[in-house]
Amino acid sequence: MNSWRVTVCALAAAIVMVGGGSAASQAQTPEVPQIQKVLSAIKAQDKGQLAVSEEDGRFLRVLIATSKAKRALEIGGASGYSAIWIGMGLRETGGTLVTMEYDPVRAKELAENVKRAGLSDIVTVVPGDAFAHLPTLSGSFDFVFLDAWKKDYKRFFEMVYPRLDPRGLFLAHNVVNKRNEMGDFLDVVLKHPALWTTIVSPSGEGMSVSMRVK
């Protein structure tokens, strides 16, 4: 099967597996008790202000696993909820994640939560300004998750796109509920000649999912 078809099938599988709701997805993507404990603690601490929902987290994990991603990048790690879901998927593929968080307090929480979840061997936390740190990273990525300042989405995309592998996935969060805050980012990815882009909404917040086809 062609590699682009494998990636499209991975996306379809992720949508189906998560689309059945939380109970269905829990049955299909179980977490170890240690990690579930950390996720629950983050949810309680953030008091309903999670960077991503549980449904979105499960979607990320399933998409990582089914696309067989190996080198992932997250911009906007917050306190680690999404990084842990991504890390669980990467543990299944043998991959690694670099996650960036600007706020020093949240970056510290992010590192602590990743450690408590037992994912320090998979997830590397980079605190500080992502615009400054991105040029210092080596290599390319086959999975990118963007959940940072919405007004800067286009700029982040332009920085990362040259390092996105062919058939790699670029995901951006909040494209439904905060669409008016991200300027013309969606126009760029929807009309880009080298991307196939769709919008999914596991939880109502929405994600754009773009695959590099050239």
Task: Describe every region a protein language model picked out.
Residues 13-18:
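Hydrophobic alpha-helical segments of integral membrane proteins
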